Amino acid sequence: MMTHLRPALASLLALSLLTGVAYPLALTGIAAVIAPDRAAGSLILREGQVVGSALIGQGFDGPGYLHPRPSASDWNAAGTSASNLGPTSAALLAEVQERQAAYEAQNGAPAPVDAVTASGSGLDPHVSPANARAQAARIARARGLDEAAVRRLIEAHVEPPLLGLWGQARVNVLAVNLALDAAGA
């Protein structure tokens, strides 16, 4: 029995060290060399303080800020999740209708799909350009800014699809809100 057990335990230990320690450390080291910002979490700093991550959404609900997509996990990265409500769920329909009515009342514009539906992770840091543009008038009113200036700021933060092929154009909510704060008012 020991003749079979000893090689099995040695293999288990060796593979555990290889896949549980060596491989993750090697990938972390490679990432730190190739893309140090992303390896560190794409943190955004203001005056030496971390204000957020370009990759993790956070809630903004003031009228002078660009609002993110709804989140089933209240933007909690430790408890990220979707709502688990299916497409035929009456509860999901009621949530979407409630979000749509609130969005249209706040912004005076039709609600784009991403304004009323949560992302799968609940932490999406981006909204669609259409969603951001629809919020421009509300943001301008709340901040006492010219709507055209807010629209220009939003357009300056539109990120194209990856290599022009994959994904969709998107706007990082935190980046726009920090730019709005930097613009004053």
Swiss-Prot record:
The chain crosses the membrane at residues 14-34. One of its GO terms (cellular component) is plasma membrane. One of its GO terms (molecular function) is P-type potassium transmembrane transporter activity. Residues 105-128 are annotated as: Disordered. Its main location: membrane. Signal peptide: none annotated. The keyword ATP-binding applies. It is a single-pass membrane protein. Pfam families: KdpC. InterPro entries: KdpC (IPR003820). The keyword Transit peptide does not apply. Keywords: ATP-binding, Cell inner membrane, Cell membrane, Ion transport, Membrane, Nucleotide-binding, Potassium, Potassium transport, Transmembrane, Transmembrane helix, Transport. It is found in: Cell inner membrane. Part of the high-affinity ATP-driven potassium transport (or Kdp) system, which catalyzes the hydrolysis of ATP coupled with the electrogenic transport of potassium into the cytoplasm. This subunit acts as a catalytic chaperone that increases the ATP-binding affinity of the ATP-hydrolyzing subunit KdpB by the formation of a transient KdpB/KdpC/ATP ternary complex. Belongs to the KdpC family. PANTHER family: POTASSIUM-TRANSPORTING ATPASE C CHAIN (PTHR30042), POTASSIUM-TRANSPORTING ATPASE KDPC SUBUNIT (PTHR30042:SF2). The system is composed of three essential subunits: KdpA, KdpB and KdpC. NCBIfam families: kdpC, PRK00315.1. This is Potassium-transporting ATPase KdpC subunit.
